[in-house]
UniProtKB/Swiss-Prot annotation:
Record GO cellular component, one term: cytoplasm
Protein name, as recorded: Gamma-glutamyl phosphate reductase
Residue stretches spanning the membrane: none
A GO term for molecular function: glutamate-5-semialdehyde dehydrogenase activity
High-level lineage: Bacteria, Pseudomonadati, Pseudomonadota, Betaproteobacteria, Burkholderiales
Pfam families for this protein: Aldedh
Entry function: Catalyzes the NADPH-dependent reduction of L-glutamate 5-phosphate into L-glutamate 5-semialdehyde and phosphate. The product spontaneously undergoes cyclization to form 1-pyrroline-5-carboxylate.
Gene symbol of the encoding locus: proA
Source organism (scientific name): Burkholderia ambifaria (strain MC40-6)
SUPFAM superfamilies: ALDH-like
Family in the record: Belongs to the gamma-glutamyl phosphate reductase family.
Entry's EC annotation: 1.2.1.41
Length: 423
């Protein structure tokens, strides 16, 4: 297979399909989503059979249990796919909305219309559910998409792509609006991220090594985040019960997500009160604690252990594991300075009853999501009321934070006049 020619052909067809998608009605897009949902329900066994072959090959390669779990299409996973499709269909269609409409002294009205981005390339690892999630969001937002999933999920993705194509055709929409790259050749990714004539934006969903490669090689703009080094700062004017709840949930609700707390900052004025009960809570949940000297002194006196001395590397680390770095800081200024220096601009929270300090934290912490008296785990499209998300961005241009339907659109200016000319 000539990868260069193959990818160029996918891009050309996607660009052509994107024009039809931009003018597609809400009814047609929702009909396509419903048709795909019904096709998954109808062909559930065939999907599981294709997936079983992918899983068998993954086991032969000796891939670990966590990888196999992400790859597997269980009955529950298929049910979640169907529910997700119908949920996206129920969301308001942002395309064509005109907002910020203002009268100008010249007599014209100026506003902004929400429009699709065009062609979106999605690069992700071997999680077949992302094929449906990404296709649904791109379809509803009026975009065409080229999906490049992990090589271990080739048969699963091909089977899903067939059903997506059927759904698009049934709704009178172009099948090329959703195309799945049908090769495991890594050169396909290299081509996709440089096809500026055909692809408007890349959304990578994967590990750090994938994102770093794309940062170095991509010519197409990206919506991405590299790390989720999230902080909770407990102020000396915090409510202790709230602090315990937030710190527990932010770390132990799920360890392997990008919005999990990785560093806990504690004001020196509350450290002796907060750290003993919190340290015992983490110890009981088998969370390894990597602590600075001040935190060690308080925790050791309270009989909490074992403790590991933190190094500078710990403040830079996204563990994605039951490991937590803890530092005692002088106060709000030191906490903000630490977060802006070591953080990844993803999600950070303060626990405090002081309104002025909370507002300062919101203004001065340079992150995509900033929270007061709430767990960092809330940094999620569903929790934010977006309905669904295609990922989270910690960049500052275009989309920032959880990226839902609106994040896959752009704004263009529209002018409504009555024959006016500029004087």
């Amino acid at each position: 297979m000539d990868i260069d020619q193959y990818m160029t052909d996918l891009g050309r067809r996607a660009r052509h399909a994107s024009r039809a998608m931009a003018r597609a009605s809400t009814a047609a897009k929702n009909a396509a989503l419903d048709a795909v949902a019904r096709a998954i329900e109808r062909d559930a066994q065939a999907l599981k059979d294709a997936n079983a072959r992918d899983v068998a090959r993954a086991r032969e390669k000796g891939l670990d249990a966590a990888f196999i779990d992400r790859l597997t299409l269980s009955d529950n996973a298929l049910k979640t796919m169907v529910e997700g499709l119908r949920q996206v269909a129920s969301l308001a269609d942002p395309i064509g909305e005109i907002g910020n409409l203002k009268y100008r002294p010249s007599g014209i009205r100026v506003g902004q219309m929400r429009v699709p981005l065009g062609v979106i390339g999605i690069i992700y690892e071997s999680r077949p559910n992302v094929t449906i999630d990404a296709a649904a969001l791109c379809l509803k937002s009026g975009n065409a998409t080229i999906l490049r999933g992990g090589s271990e999920a080739l048969e699963s993705n091909a089977a899903l792509a067939k059903l997506i194509g059927e759904g698009l055709e049934a709704a009178g929409l172009p099948q090329d609006a959703v195309q799945v790259v049908a090769t495991a050749d890594r050169a396909a990714v290299g081509k996709l991220i440089t096809m500026t004539d055909y692809v408007d934006v890349i959304v990578p969903r994967g590990g750090k090594s994938l994102i770093e490669r794309l940062i170095n090689e991509a010519r197409v703009p990206m919506i991405k985040h590299l790390d989720g080094i999230c902080h909770v700062y407990v102020d000396d004017r915090a409510d202790l019960a709230k602090a315990l709840t937030v710190c527990d949930n932010a770390k132990t609700h799920r360890y392997g997500t990008c919005n999990t707390m990785e560093t806990l900052l504690v004001a020196s004025g509350i450290a002796a009160t907060l750290l003993p009960p919190l340290g015992k809570l983490y110890r009981d949940k088998q969370v390894e604690l990597r602590v600075d000297a001040a935190a060690r002194a308080v925790l050791a006196e309270a009989g909490v252990g074992p403790l590991v001395d933190a190094t500078d590397e710990d403040w830079h680390t996204e563990y994605l594991a039951p490991v937590l770095a803890i530092k005692v800081v002088d106060g709000l200024d030191a906490a903000i300075e630490h977060i802006n220096h070591y953080g990844s601009h993803h999600t950070d929270a303060i626990v405090t009853e002081d309104h002025d300090r909370a507002m300062r934290f919101l203004r001065e912490v340079d992150s995509a999501s900033v929270m007061v008296n709430a767990s960092t785990r809330f940094a999620d499209g569903f929790e934010f009321g977006l309905g669904a998300e295609i990922g989270i961005s910690n960049d500052k241009l275009h989309a920032r934070g959880p990226v839902g339907l609106e994040g896959l659109t752009s704004l263009k200016y529209v002018v409504l006049g009555h024959g006016e000319g500029r004087q």
